[in-house]
C-alpha cells in the first residue's frame, strides 16, 4: 500500500511539470498509520517536455563520459520524470524511496584539483533511486563523498545549480546541497519542505520566524522561495491527517496548489 501511495505522489509531481515561473516546492505529508505522500511543483520558466520512464533492476550505468566516472548496476526498479529528456528530475523506486531535484542558485560543486570519479548532475537522482531503499542508506553512502558532481549548463544556457530532496516510505527525509564544493546533508523526518534560494539552513531560520507568528495569524503570500517554504511548512502539517490514500493524495494536491506560481508569473530579481 505504501508503494501505491508513493506512486500517487509521483503523479502529483508529474502533472505539475508544465507550469512557468522558475520556482519549485517539495513537501512530504506524514499521516497516521505510516501514510506518507511526497508532492512537488515544477514551476519552471518554460516547457520541460517531460516524459515518464520505467527502469527495471539490473541496468548497468555510468555517471558520465570518459573513463573516470562512477559505474553501478541498478539494485531497484524505478519510475522517473525526465525534463528535456536529459535526466530524471523526480522519481520513485520499488522500495518507496522518492527523490526530487530543485533549483538552488547558491549551489557550487567544484573543488580545485578534484580527481574523484564523476557523477553527472543529470543522473544524480537516478543514482539514488537505483542504489538505496531508505533515506538512512542514502545518507550513509552519500556522506562519504566518493564522487564529484559534473554540472553542465541546461538548455538555454541556464547554469545547472540544483539540490536534492530524498524521502522514503517511513516518512524520513534528507536534503543534499553542495555549497562551495562541499556536500551539506540535513537529515530528519522534520525536514518535510524544500524550495529554492537561499540554502536550506537559511530557509530554516526564516521559517522559524514565521512559526513564532503562527500560520493562522499570518503567512507570507508572494511567490518568493522563502514565502513558499513558510506556507508549505504550515499547511503540510495543518491539513487533515488521514490514512485514506485517496484523501491523502488530494490533500497533498491542495497544499501544492497553495504554493504553485500562477502561469506566466515570476519575480525578475528573485526568480527562484
Regions found by a protein language model. Name each.
Residues 1-6:
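Positively charged n-region of N-terminal signal peptides that target proteins for export
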Residues 7-18:
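Bacterial N-terminal signal peptides
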Residues 21-37, 51, 61-62, 150-152, ...:
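C-terminus-biased signal that marks the final domain/tail of proteins
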Residues 23-116, 149:
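A contiguous strand-loop segment
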Residues 30-33, 93-95, 168-171, 177-182:
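Short acidic-glycine loop/turn motifs at beta-strand connectors
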Residues 47-48, 108-110, 174-177, 184-187:
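Short helix/loop capping segments that flank catalytic or ligand/cofactor-binding pockets
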Residues 115-151, 245-255:
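Proteins synthesized as precursors that undergo proteolytic processing into mature forms
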Residues 135, 139-176:
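Aromatic- and glycine-enriched pocket-lining scaffold segments that form the walls
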Amino acid at each position: 500500500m505504501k508503494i501505491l501511495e508513493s506512486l500517487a505522489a509521483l503523479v502529483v509531481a508529474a502533472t505539475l511539470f508544465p507550469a512557468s515561473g522558475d520556482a519549485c516546492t517539495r513537501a512530504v505529508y506524514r499521516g497516521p498509520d505510516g501514510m506518507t505522500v511526497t508532492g512537488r511543483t515544477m514551476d519552471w520558466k518554460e516547457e520541460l517536455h517531460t516524459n515518464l520512464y520505467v527502469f527495471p533492476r539490473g541496468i548497468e550505468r555510468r555517471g558520465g563520459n570518459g573513463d573516470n566516472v562512477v559505474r553501478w548496476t541498478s539494485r531497484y526498479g524505478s519510475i522517473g520524470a525526465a525534463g528535456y529528456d536529459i535526466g530524471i528530475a523526480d522519481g520513485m523506486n520499488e522500495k518507496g524511496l522518492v527523490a526530487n531535484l530543485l533549483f538552488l542558485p547558491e549551489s557550487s560543486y567544484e573543488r580545485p584539483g578534484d580527481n574523484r570519479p564523476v557523477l553527472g548532475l543529470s543522473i544524480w537522482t537516478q543514482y539514488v533511486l537505483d542504489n538505496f531503499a531508505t533515506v538512512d542508506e542514502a545518507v550513509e553512502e552519500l556522506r562519504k563523498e566518493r564522487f564529484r558532481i559534473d554540472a553542465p549548463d541546461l538548455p538555454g544556457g541556464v547554469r545547472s545549480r540544483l539540490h536534492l530532496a530524498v524521502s522514503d516510505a517511513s516518512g524520513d527525509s534528507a536534503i543534499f546541497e553542495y555549497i562551495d564544493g562541499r556536500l551539506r546533508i540535513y537529515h530528519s523526518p522534520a525536514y518535510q519542505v524544500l524550495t529554492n534560494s537561499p540554502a536550506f539552513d537559511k530557509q530554516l531560520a526564516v521559517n522559524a520566524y514565521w512559526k513564532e507568528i503562527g500560520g493562522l495569524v499570518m503567512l507570507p503570500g508572494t511567490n518568493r522561495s522563502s514565502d513558499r517554504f513558510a506556507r508549505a511548512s504550515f499547511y503540510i502539517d495543518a491539513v487533515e491527517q488521514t490514512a485514506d490514500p485517496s484523501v491523502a493524495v488530494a490533500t497533498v494536491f491542495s497544499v501544492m496548489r497553495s504554493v504553485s506560481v500562477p502561469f506566466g508569473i515570476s519575480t525578475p530579481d528573485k526568480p527562484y
